[in-house]
């Protein structure tokens, strides 16, 4: 295929798509130019079905530092593992694409997005999402798209599609919404306590804007799209399925209805193992035993899936016996740990999260150096999910994509209520340790984080709580579930997480397994989530109603002073010599910003006070008319140099020592002598003149003797 170019304009930026020039060995490839951001997307598919029991889709988003005209950091000067932002963007693209493949599709699919040039006012992630959908759509990969995504901002009551950097900084909303022509299938958002009505309108505005991008993709597919490949879908043997269902469906149904998680898992596993043992023995000599046993496992999964959904939609019974809109039992505890700066333990049923607060000087902020201009990140929320939380063994290592994503969601939810830097000049880190999990652990971490912040004395604007909503839909009828547990998440159609305060929503995240959901479902889910959020806030506020007035004794205390900008170099000294000396003497930590704000951190108030004295002395300036108790440091023929304070000396001219004539300075003064002086002049170069005699009453002039005349 020769190069073909397609052009349109979207949200104020040119959108140019090039096909047929690069990456021609991939199943599908595009170059998307949005503004001055350029993203190459290549999609490939394996020739055979993978052996696993899931769809092996991998989406990558690669940030090449040359795209922003930067050298990579580190010794190797080469891009390493993906940044957190790159990982989150890859997840953002994966989530709306994944539901658009057929049930039973098991071929491995890999979509790679490489940012080749970067324009901070034209979203590279949105260009990558567009390119991912288009590369799949024009390829022979059986993708049931297209999909597209946009960012939505909210400024002065107006919604803005794909806001630029300046607009996003002023926006009360940072929403990414994606979907197909028919419906929304992915949401990711942070918001400054916006109402459910505004959030719903933002979602609908975003979906409306998506239509233009989907229509553009359809035009391109009509010109360059390939015929879709015929691939084998995972299908079980119908006779085998009928046999297993007839024999064991009643037993599995009974096991699924056991209310307690571990007991239910044991009951269902016992039925499954019994079935597997029977069929493994029956077909032991069959050469297709592996395929048969794969089908047996899949059939049992489908039976459990069907029973969970039937219970909810027909009997209105949930696996643990709750009502459709009922929250599991709640418990909130503060001060779970000694010594730390704050801690909160939040439990919802069999999901439990422990959040630990750490406060630090602003010098501990994380420096983010990606494609965007370097910036400092003051608030960090980290989420850890050990395997013991679900009673299993597993790998331990660096945080995976899921943990990074859940941490980022909690970060968005909580950062909306943090005090400003001026109100609270600390770097803030929260770590959520999931101790038990049966669904909605990310929302438990938000609730635990609120407890830890308030227990630690961080003056947040309001407590935040989170809840996860679910959905069971057969295409015609649907049921929205409040506070989904693990089984409902696994076999359900939606995981819609909503976090916020009593005033409004601070974060949203939605993933679905079906093609999309309607505005009616969104509205109902948001309304149920609000009711649940208020119930959780009642429990949190009953434990701790407001942030404590003081920090924990172990937290670093802080004091700030303001110095002139031109005095910053005086405090720092050559090569940091002066500030290092102060830190060594007092044991404090010191941060100085470009505006002359000096923050001093220590758990010892006396050390803070001593540091303030030292810095005040360093930046102190002599003033005309002020009196100083000085020390003579040098004597010259023309006068004496005295030290007023720290590194500020003044000259007392010989004529300013006394009202009477001074012949030799050394006859009157000696080095080391303490004297009181008054500053009488400071010249344009900062040189100070002082006087001793100005502090001494001027003696009266001698009276003239009258001449006697004979």
From Swiss-Prot:
Its cofactor is Mg(2+). Its EC number is 2.7.7.8. Residues 556-615 form the KH domain. GO terms for molecular function: 3'-5'-RNA exonuclease activity; magnesium ion binding; polyribonucleotide nucleotidyltransferase activity; RNA binding. Residues 700-710 have a biased composition (Basic and acidic residues). Transmembrane segments: none annotated. InterPro entries: ExoRNase_PH_dom1 (IPR001247), ExoRNase_PH_dom2 (IPR015847), ExoRNase_PH_dom2_sf (IPR036345), KH_dom (IPR004087), KH_dom_type_1 (IPR004088), KH_dom_type_1_sf (IPR036612), NA-bd_OB-fold (IPR012340), PNPase (IPR012162). The keyword Magnesium applies. The keyword 4Fe-4S does not apply. It comes from the Bacteria. GO terms for cellular component: cytosol. Residues 625-693 form the S1 motif domain. Residues 691-710 are annotated as: Disordered. It catalyses: RNA(n+1) + phosphate = RNA(n) + a ribonucleoside 5'-diphosphate. Belongs to the polyribonucleotide nucleotidyltransferase family. Involved in mRNA degradation. Catalyzes the phosphorolysis of single-stranded polyribonucleotides processively in the 3'- to 5'-direction. This is Polyribonucleotide nucleotidyltransferase. It comes from Streptococcus pyogenes serotype M6 (strain ATCC BAA-946 / MGAS10394). The gene is pnp.
